[in-house]
Amino acid sequence: MTPQAFYLVLEQAGFALTNHQKEQFDTYFKLLVDWNRKINLTAITEENEVYLKHFYDSVAPLLQGYIPNEPLRLLDIGAGAGFPSIPMKIMFPKLDVTIIDSLNKRIHFLQLLAKELGLEGVHFYHGRAEDFGQDKQFRGQFDLVTARAVARMQILSELTIPFLKIKGKLIALKAQAADQELEEAKKALQLLFAKVLDHQPYQLPNGDGRYITLVEKKKETPNKYPRKAGIPNKKPL
C-alpha cells in the first residue's frame, strides 16, 4: 500500500488527511526505519508494508466508527513503536493519548517521535501494566484502552480493564484466532465485570484478515486485579 493509496482509502472512508497529517505519517515512517537500525522496533520496514500493516491497521477502529474525534483519554498498552495509538492521534488530534511500555528504549523513541511530529496531549511511561493498574493516577481513569497484538484476551483483559472508567471500552486488535480467544476469556471477563459488545472481522486492503473486539467495563474492577507483574501471564484468569 503506497502512501498515496493509504490517503485515498482514508479519503474514501470520509477521513481526508491534511498536508500536515500526511507529512506526519511520512516523518513517522522515516524515523521508524532510522531508529529500527539501533533498536528492534519492528520487523516491517518496507514503506508499502508499513503503511498497510502498521498505519492502516492502527487506524482501522477509527474507520469502523469505534472511536470519535473527541477529547477522550486513551491508554495504549504495550504500544511498541506507537501502534495503534500514534497513528490514531495523528488522525484524531483531540485524543489525549497515554502509552505504557516495558522497554525504556522504546519510550525514548516515542518521546522523540512525538516531538518531531509536533504532537501535544501525549504521555509516555516506562513500566509494567500490572504495576500501573494498581496506581490511583491510572486506575479507572481512561475512556478507552487499546492493545494491538499484546497478549491473548484471557491475559489482556486483566492488564487493561482496571484502567477503564465504568462504561469505558477496551479495543483489542487481533490478527487471528480471535474467536477461540474470546471463548477462553469468558471467565476472566466475568471476574473483571466486563462484557463483549462487538467482535468484528475485517480485511486489510490486501485481503489479510483481522479482528476488532470491543469490551465494555460494567462495574469497578475488584481491588485484587491486576495481580502482580508476571502472574497474569503465568496463571491466566
Swiss-Prot record:
Its EC number is 2.1.1.-. One of its GO terms (molecular function) is rRNA (guanine-N7-)-methyltransferase activity. S-adenosyl-L-methionine binds at residues 78, 83, 129-130, 148. One of its GO terms (cellular component) is cytosol. The keyword Secreted does not apply. CDD domains: AdoMet_MTases. HAMAP family: 16SrRNA_methyltr_G. Belongs to the methyltransferase superfamily. RNA methyltransferase RsmG family. This is Ribosomal RNA small subunit methyltransferase G. The lineage of its organism: Bacteria, Bacillati, Bacillota, Bacilli, Lactobacillales.
